[in-house]
Amino acid sequence: MDATFSVDAWSAFAAGLEEDAAWREWARAPWLPVGDAMPALAEMAPMQRRRVERLGRAALQVAWRCQGDGAGEMPMVFASRHGDLDRTHRMLAELARDEPLSPTQFGLSTHNAIAAQYSIARGLQGNYLAVSAVRATPEAAVTEALGLLADGAPAVLVVVYDDAIPGDYNAFLDEPDALHAWAWRIVPPHGDLPCLSLRAGEPATGGRLPHSLDVLRFFLSGDATLPGADGGGWLRHA
């Protein structure tokens, strides 16, 4: 399987960062986004949007913008290290108080729920996956996308998203956390677009950003390499 690919469209969201120009400037001097900003997600019908919480809104907003209106069906890989942990944490607190759980809230807390809501809202019937691989979640997502390209898909939508975790879990943090979401439309290597690849290498050490956000910084900055979270790494081809 060829581990080289191009990105022909992208979108990203975080507090204080939404426009492409702002993201490119951020990539030159990155900082950890903080704040309670939430995208409008105006593309989604209000009755559907009301069920989507902050993390889901960020993920669906970048997916909608990246896929576009005229792209048609394509396989999708939704990837999040923690998923909608805030919703899960609230349900665990309800269980601890011996309160009944809402079946709707349980369904919306599953790891593929955000992808499912996107698929339903857009009337999509194609293949989608939901993956999680600790700090190596972006690498796992792109690896899945490369497999789909190898199977003949002309393009794959990759959506990576995470949020700050509830305070009760802070003792388990091994990297900074913040709300962020980004999407790439991945295509086979294209001569008119920069080519990226995954490769073997030394694992990344902790930095000032969540690893998944650092991958976006690498993509936007033009850097030649970025260590991966699992012993692999990212390479930009000249």
Which residues does each predicted region cover?
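Conserved "HGTGT" condensation-loop signature of ketosynthase/thiolase-family condensing enzymes
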Residues: 1-105, 109-130, 136, 160-238
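Active-site-proximal alpha-helical scaffold in enzymes
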Residues: 60-63, 132-156
